[in-house]
Amino acid sequence: MAYNTGRYLKMAARQLTKNFDQFARQYDLTSTQMAIIDYLGRRTAAQILQRDIEQEFNIRRSTATLILQRMERKGLLQRFVAHHDARQKMVQLTAKGQELITLISQYMASQQADLEQHFGTTRIREFEEVLQYYLNLEGDQH
């Protein structure tokens, strides 16, 4: 049987998203919203711009705007004009969003611990090299 790593990777990513969505749903979140809260929670000292979120999650400005607007409506974060550049939006968790940081980070840590227990850190690091290869591909590179 021929292996197709890209296909397996895509299937695994879908399954991982389904699992994250299932966890996030109990807090009226999507997996993407959960990931953004986790990202903002880990960068507490930094001033986060919408542009930083776009780069971190490899999404377009319009997609980021839509996601962040929905999170604003839910009272999870607020966006405001950056002090140093009026064209940029700063993003900050509200108290409601901050309440979810611990739950989300514990969930993410437990997922990582399960992975490490099952495969060991060496195999995970090797797999991360494969993932990094895919992340660095651009366009029609072979």
Model-derived features: positions:
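Alpha-helical linker/hinge and terminal dimerization helices associated
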Residues: 9-12, 16-19, 57, 100, ...
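N-terminal helix-turn-helix DNA-binding core of bacterial DNA-binding proteins
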Residues: 18-60
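Alpha-helical DNA-recognition elements
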Residues: 22, 70, 133
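Short, hydrophobic-biased segments on the C-terminal half of alpha helices
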Residues: 50, 68-69
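Charged, amphipathic alpha-helical coiled-coil/dimerization segments
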Residues: 69-129
